[in-house]
């Protein structure tokens, strides 16, 4: 026959599985708590990311017209919109951002003219035409902060009383927003 163990020995052996069961429950609770913490962190990060607006920089652009001619200043550049980022100062378009610019120049003149488009005083012009009555040009130029784009129109005719232009416009559009800008 088999020998039966006394009750005291059974109690001693039974406590060990109960301790391992408590240890297993503790480990499972810790894992659940960490999972809950990770879920809570993910939800908080998700909602905080929704509150941050992803704003792209406004594209630098301007459309100016030149229709009025003054003997001292040449053609006067005027912008039709007040809310444009780029501005006209001292008859020049001020460049605020480094990068490539798409430049369009159009106009029909009443006389033969010499036209040049400059960006710095002592540099070669971006664009130059001699003895023309109209211009319709499109170009890309690399401009930097503090450059000033201005138009120089001259004529050999001494009578400037009837000197005018039809449809004179200059358009500049920055092609790579996000470059160095000072606004």
Swiss-Prot record:
Induction, per UniProt: By HTLV-1 transactivator p40-Tax.
Keyword Membrane: yes
Record flagged with keyword Membrane: yes
Membrane association type: Single-pass type II membrane protein
Positions of the THD domain: 51-173
UniProt-listed GO biological process terms: acute inflammatory response; cellular response to lipopolysaccharide; cellular response to prostaglandin E stimulus; defense response to nematode; immune response; inflammatory response; memory T cell activation; negative regulation of DNA-binding transcription factor activity
Entry-listed glycosylation sites: 90, 114, 152, 157
Complexes and interactors: Homotrimer.
Function description: Cytokine that binds to TNFRSF4. Co-stimulates T-cell proliferation and cytokine production.
Protein name in UniProt: Tumor necrosis factor ligand superfamily member 4
Native source species: Homo sapiens (Human)
Gene: TNFSF4
């Amino acid at each position: 026959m088999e020998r039966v163990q006394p009750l005291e020995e059974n109690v001693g052996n039974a406590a060990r599985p109960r301790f391992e069961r408590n240890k297993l429950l503790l480990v499972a609770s810790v894992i659940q708590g960490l999972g809950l913490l990770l879920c809570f962190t993910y939800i908080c990060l998700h909602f905080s990311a929704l509150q941050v607006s992803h704003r792209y920089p406004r594209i630098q652009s301007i459309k100016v017209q030149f229709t009025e001619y003054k003997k001292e200043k040449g053609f006067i550049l005027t912008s039709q919109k007040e809310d444009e980022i780029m501005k006209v100062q001292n008859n020049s378009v001020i460049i605020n951002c480094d990068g490539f610019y798409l430049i369009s120049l159009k106009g029909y003149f009443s006389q033969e003219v010499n036209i040049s488009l400059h960006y710095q005083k002592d540099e070669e012009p971006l664009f130059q035409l001699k003895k023309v009555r109209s211009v319709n040009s499109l170009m890309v130029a690399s401009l930097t902060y503090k450059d000033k784009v201005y138009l120089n129109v001259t004529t050999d005719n001494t009578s400037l009383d009837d000197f005018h232009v039809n449809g004179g416009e200059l358009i500049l559009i920055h092609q790579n927003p996000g470059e160095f800008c000072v606004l």
